[in-house]
Regions:
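Sec-dependent signal peptide recognition
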Residues: 1-9
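C-terminal motif of bacterial Sec signal peptides marking the signal peptidase cleavage site
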Residues: 12-15
């Protein structure tokens, strides 16, 4: 009896010590559209990343406005970041749109505008990807979209003008 009891206790301890999978260490079988599959990007149109976490307005002058920290979307599929700065830059989306509209009203041109609509607690698009998304697959996708749109605008500016300006609005 004593030997059986010890064997059962040993088995229970051994079986309970196994790692229980969590969302962070599970491999999720999720496929995203290829970056750029929503292009080519045309002036006057608006483009959205997955679930509208990122918004891209192509421009027609060699100026890019980047808004990495102004969003207010807080989806449950993206866990809160646990380290790094998480304070939202207030009114930066409104400022970027106002600047873009000012250029149009006064000069009939518009800069490129890329907006991160996620709260900074979910994604900090101005950090390296590890700190920015902290391992969340959906935050990483939004990060990739944000930077893809910036690089698309940058490449178009280089192709058409050879040089331009990028203003990162905070």
């Amino acid at each position: 009896f004593r030997l059986n009891t010890l064997a059962i206790i040993f088995f229970l301890i051994l079986s309970c010590s196994k790692d229980i999978p969590t969302q962070d260490n599970l491999t999720l079988d999720i496929e995203f559209n290829e970056l750029g599959s929503d292009g080519p990007y045309l002036y006057g149109e608006t483009y959205y990343g997955r679930k509208s976490y990122i918004t891209y307005y192509p421009g027609n002058i060699p100026v890019i406005l980047s808004i990495p920290h102004g969003g207010d979307i807080s989806p449950s599929e993206i866990s809160n970041r646990t380290y790094g700065v998480s304070v939202t830059d207030s009114n930066t989306i409104e400022l970027g749109i106002a600047i873009r509209n000012y250029f149009y009203s006064n000069y009939n041109v518009r800069p490129y505008l890329i907006i991160n609509n996620l709260k900074r607690t979910k994604l900090d698009a101005n950090r390296d990807k590890v700190e920015a998304a902290q391992g969340n697959l959906f935050a990483e996708r939004a990060f990739d979209e944000f930077h893809f749109y910036i690089n698309s605008a940058r490449q178009e500016i280089i192709n058409n003008n050879s040089t331009g300006f990028l203003f990162d609005i905070h």
